[in-house]
């Protein structure tokens, strides 16, 4: 997983609330277990509408999604995180996330940033007025900066550390590879049975 310290990019304003994982990536696209190749599936039902914000070329190349309350609710789908990452998003900013989505995002290298709705509305206004508006997300400082305005965001220390170190679950486990190898080398090749 790629390390995350500071990210600067443009953003897409998704003025919708209660966006569930089935809307992020419909179930018909869940037939693969690889983490890539899902960009075309992201919001595929909504993207059929040419007026949908991801179809607007002025937001092309954006790496931050700014959404409404309750983003990523519904069933657990790692594919939702994979689709967002595959599209190019590194950060999703919203007032509240579904708990399972939030956990999957943190483990998948997508930073879920929670800001108050008032801050979200200000950011929406800025990026709609000028789609080239730059947003900086500083994970070390736990701050979002747009223009000269800064907002702090909460994130537990362990999740912050994992993202800054670029550690997914496998990477975290591999940090203990010497200990795991020593244990495996010292244990019996079979387990005793109880007669």
UniProtKB/Swiss-Prot annotation:
Record-linked InterPro entries: 3-IsopropMal_deHydase_ssu (IPR004431), Aconitase/3IPM_dehydase_swvl (IPR015928), AconitaseA/IPMdHydase_ssu_swvl (IPR000573), IPMI_Swivel (IPR033940), LeuD (IPR050075)
Coiled-coil stretches: none
A cellular-component GO term for this protein: 3-isopropylmalate dehydratase complex
Metabolic or biological pathway: Amino-acid biosynthesis; L-leucine biosynthesis; L-leucine from 3-methyl-2-oxobutanoate: step 2/4
Catalysed conversion reaction: (2R,3S)-3-isopropylmalate = (2S)-2-isopropylmalate
An annotated GO BP: L-leucine biosynthetic process
Keyword Lyase: yes
EC number: 4.2.1.33
CDD domains: IPMI_Swivel
One Gene Ontology MF term: 3-isopropylmalate dehydratase activity
Keyword annotations: Amino-acid biosynthesis, Branched-chain amino acid biosynthesis, Leucine biosynthesis, Lyase
Domain of life: Bacteria
Family recorded in the similarity comment: Belongs to the LeuD family. LeuD type 1 subfamily.
Function: Catalyzes the isomerization between 2-isopropylmalate and 3-isopropylmalate, via the formation of 2-isopropylmaleate.
Assembly and oligomerization: Heterodimer of LeuC and LeuD.
NCBIfam families: leuD, PRK01641.1
Name recorded for this polypeptide: 3-isopropylmalate dehydratase small subunit
């Amino acid at each position: 997983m790629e390390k995350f310290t500071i990210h600067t990019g443009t953003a897409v304003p998704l003025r919708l609330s209660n966006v569930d994982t089935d809307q992020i990536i419909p179930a018909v696209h869940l037939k693969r277990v690889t983490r890539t190749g899902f960009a075309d599936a992201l919001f595929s039902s909504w993207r059929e509408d040419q007026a949908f914000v991801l179809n607007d070329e002025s937001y092309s190349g954006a790496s931050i999604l700014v959404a409404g309350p309750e983003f990523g609710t519904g069933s657990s789908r790692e594919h939702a995180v994979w689709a967002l990452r595959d599209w190019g998003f590194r950060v999703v900013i919203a007032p509240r996330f579904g708990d399972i989505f939030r956990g999957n995002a943190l483990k998948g290298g997508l930073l879920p940033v929670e800001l108050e709705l008032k801050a979200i509305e200000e950011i929406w206004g800025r990026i709609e007025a000028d789609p080239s508006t730059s947003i900086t997300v500083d994970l070390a400082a736990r701050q979002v900066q747009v223009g000269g305005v800064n907002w702090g965001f909460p994130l537990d220390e362990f999740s912050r550390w994992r993202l800054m170190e670029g550690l997914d679950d496998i990477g975290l486990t591999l940090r203990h590879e010497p200990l795991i190898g020593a244990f495996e080398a010292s244990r019996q090749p079979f387990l005793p049975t109880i007669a």
